[in-house]
């Protein structure tokens, strides 16, 4: 089977499964999910450590994202018996199963980020010529 036939079959299957696929993608394909899971994949992390490592994330955005990830079974939240009380977040086996596709996506972004930015600039420089 050639590459285009494979892509056509994948595209047809994705469209047929859209009722199942879209809600899941909505839960994992937001601004911070990939980055949060990438940070906690190697080892569990506390909230402030996550906040320090995720440049630009607000306290509220991180708290909301972690709650959503816990609710969706991708992250566990453990209250630590320390003074003051600490909370640690760890990736679940389900969350860990996203590692390979996320690594592929991050690699693609690193390899093609300049091309995407150049295309954006070309488009923006065209103005409203349509």
What is the meaning of each model-derived region?
Residues 1-19, 24, 53, 65, ...:
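Recognition helices and adjacent regulatory flanks at domain boundaries
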Residues 1-8, 39, 51, 59, ...:
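Short amphipathic alpha-helical interaction elements located at domain edges
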Residues 15-61:
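N-terminal helix-turn-helix DNA-binding core of bacterial DNA-binding proteins
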Residues 34, 38, 72, 101-116:
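Alpha-helical linker/hinge and terminal dimerization helices associated
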Residues 44-85:
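Canonical helix-turn-helix DNA-binding module
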Residues 54, 66, 95, 99-102, ...:
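Short amphipathic alpha-helical/adjacent loop interface patches that line ligand
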Residues 81-105:
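Basic, amphipathic "hinge/linker" alpha-helix immediately C-terminal to the N-terminal HTH DNA-binding motif
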Residues 118-130:
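Exposed, interaction-prone assembly regions rather than primary DNA-binding/catalytic cores
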């Amino acid at each position: 089977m050639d590459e285009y036939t494979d892509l056509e079959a994948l595209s047809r299957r994705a469209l047929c499964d859209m009722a199942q696929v879209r809600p899941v993608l909505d839960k994992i394909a937001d601004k911070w999910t990939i980055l949060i899971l990438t940070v906690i994949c190697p080892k569990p992390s506390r909230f402030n450590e996550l906040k320090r490592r995720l440049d630009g994330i607000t306290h509220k955005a991180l708290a909301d994202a972690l709650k959503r990830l816990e609710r969706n079974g991708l992250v566990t939240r453990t209250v630590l018996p320390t003074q003051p009380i600490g909370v640690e977040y760890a990736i679940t086996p389900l969350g860990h199963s996203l590692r390979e596709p996320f690594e592929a996506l991050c690699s693609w972004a690193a390899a093609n980020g300049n091309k995407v930015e150049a295309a954006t600039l070309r488009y923006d420089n065209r103005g409203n010529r349509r």
